């Protein structure tokens, strides 16, 4: 049996743009994508800290160091510049792969520049092994 697990996330990123008339996707600074182990065209879930809205779409790279977080297409109705979001990537894992899973959490500042990267290890006995 496979399980859907968190493999990486960008925590508390600030939306910089919302482009309703674009085809779709979320455009994310390429440095943030790499740090969170998110590939171009990978499906991600975007969650608003303002209103708990969740949206699934695919990620596209923005120029490195740009700090760009742009929701394109329909989610532009739900996410506005200045909103804080969590961008989560997931993967399907076999039971025997889960023990080796080490999701990356990328923390950013108000300009979406990387402040810290944490690797979260398997939780055992109620404590995360980091």
Where are these regions (language model features)?
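Peripheral, non-AAA+ core regions of ATP-driven protein-machinery
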Residues: 3, 8, 97-122, 126-130
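Compact, glycine-rich, soluble single-domain proteins
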Residues: 5, 15-16, 20-94, 99, ...
């Amino acid at each position: 049996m496979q399980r859907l697990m968190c493999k990486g996330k960008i925590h508390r990123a600030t939306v910089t743009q919302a482009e309703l008339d674009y085809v779709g996707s979320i455009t994310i600074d390429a440095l943030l994508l790499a740090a969170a182990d998110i590939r171009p065209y990978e499906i991600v879930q975007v969650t608003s800290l303002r209103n708990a809205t969740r949206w699934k779409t695919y990620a596209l790279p923005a120029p490195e160091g740009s700090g760009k977080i742009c929701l394109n297409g329909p989610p532009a109705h739900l996410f506005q510049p200045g909103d804080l979001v969590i961008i989560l990537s997931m993967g399907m894992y076999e039971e025997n792969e889960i023990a080796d899973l080490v999701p990356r959490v990328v923390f950013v500042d108000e300009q979406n520049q990387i402040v810290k990267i944490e690797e979260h290890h398997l939780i055992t006995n109620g404590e995360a092994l980091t």
